[in-house]
Regions:
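Polytopic transmembrane helical bundles with strong interfacial aromatic enrichment
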Residues: 2-256
């Protein structure tokens, strides 16, 4: 890692070294964990109650539309999680960042969980709307590929006796899989799919009624905080486990 970092400027090197310090990360994670976990629980519960029990039914879909309050945030977090996984993989390859390796390993299962939730709720939503649990359209297929990319990353980083080889192989797979993200995003525009175009965009006003939009946004914030809280907790545990193993190994070598 040091050899790669020396190619950067002094200020960048100092910033990377500070962030890569396990003790500093553990202190930061311990400080932010309660501020992530408690709001995540409260906001998610509030959003789900608002969406599932208070918001109105859709005039076409009826109460089936309430699946949206779980499905849509899960779909957004599935793609966002993979983008973060790719960013950590890039940092791992370019700067040999140890925390990037551990964060990527811990993001994988969380992202896979949200992707699986997206697929499951989408299937439940699709049955009453389309008359089938599954349809091989572009959006569904690309999200399924995303799920397999997550599973492939999880398997690949654990497939080698040398952890560094596993980290490198997983990072390469993650970066190659980034090409799937724009396919997921724009599949409804590029191909004729059963999914409707995006109702919330950065360039225009949302086409969704406000009494449905607000609980959806609250659920999304809650899901994002939940994702962050789980990843921080898992990465913190991974760093602590590595430090404990290092201490035990040092004691064993000293005893010999």
């Amino acid at each position: 890692m040091d050899a790669a970092i020396t190619t950067l400027g002094p200020r960048a090197r100092g910033g990377l070294h500070r962030f890569a310090n396990p003790g500093r990360f553990l202190r930061l994670a311990a400080a932010v964990q309660p501020w992530l976990t408690v709001p995540a629980i409260l906001i998610t519960l509030a959003g789900l109650y608002w969406g599932l029990f208070v918001s109105p039914a859709d005039w076409q879909q009826g109460d089936a539309v309430r699946i949206m309050y779980i499905h849509v945030p899960s779909a957004w977090l599935a793609s966002l999680g993979y983008f973060l996984l790719a960013c950590c993989s890039f940092a791992s390859i370019v700067w040999r960042h140890p925390l990037a390796d551990m964060a990527a390993v811990e993001i994988g299962p969380v992202g896979a969980g949200f992707t699986g939730l997206c697929l499951a709720t989408g299937s439940l939503w699709g049955k009453p709307m389309w008359g089938a649990w599954w349809v091989w359209d572009a959006r569904l297929t690309s999200v399924l590929i995303l799920f397999f990319l997550y599973l492939g990353h999880i398997a690949l980083v654990r497939a080698f006796d040398d952890p560094q080889r596993g980290y490198r192989a997983g990072a390469i797979l993650a970066l190659v899989g980034v090409v799937n993200l724009p396919i997921i995003k724009y599949s409804v525009d590029w191909w004729n799919t059963l999914h409707q175009p995006a109702t919330i965009t950065l360039t225009g006003a949302p086409t969704m009624a406000l009494d449905m939009l607000w609980p959806l946004l609250v659920c999304t914030i809650g899901f994002m905080l939940t994702f962050a809280a789980i990843v921080v907790a898992r990465t913190r545990a991974a760093v602590m486990e590595r430090r404990i193993r290092g201490l035990l190994l040092a004691r064993s070598e000293a005893a010999e």
